[in-house]
Amino acid sequence: RENRIRNALAELEQSDFDYVFIDCPPSLGLLTINALVAAPEVLIPIQCEYYALEGVSQLMNNIGLVKAHLNPLLDVTTVLLTMYDGRTKLADQVAEEVRRHFADKVLKTVIPRSVKVSEAPGYSMTVIDYDPGSRGAMSYLDASREIAERGAAPVVKGYL
């Protein structure tokens, strides 16, 4: 059961993809476990809010379990700070704590709290399609460039 996504992705090994992103819910259900088993890398988006830190702690425990029992190649390589509101001390404190814990894994780009980012899914659109010139869209493009500059982990057979 835990290998369904890995098996499906094996069909893409001969394709010319630089990255394959698997967007998962924050809960640890079968979809998330399948994604963690299939992937060599994890990108964690973290909201700059208090309770997000508690969720990250649980996620790291779960990643450790998957790494120990199902996918020894699994590694958190990238952390993206989201819903950042520079007007609040809390956002700065959360960002500082995340940077202290994850160090160079945290992207320099942060995604600001934005009405446009929040509205886009309601129209079944990405923020880049919904409002390409918005701060949120531009920040996501900056983050994607930063990820591309870092480069992907080498592909290991069976792990796309």
Regions found by a protein language model. Name each.
Residues 1-18, 70, 120-123, 127:
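P-loop/Walker-type NTP enzyme "switch/lid" segment
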Residues 4, 58, 139:
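Charged catalytic carboxylate motif
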Residues 10-115:
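Conserved catalytic-core segment of NTP-binding enzymes
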Residues 112, 118, 128:
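Nucleotide phosphate-binding site architecture
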Residues 121-142:
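C-terminal boundary of histidine-terminating zinc-finger modules
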Residues 141-153:
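A short, amphipathic alpha-helical segment
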Residues 152-160:
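C-terminal helical "lid" subdomain and adjoining coupling/linker elements of P-loop NTPases
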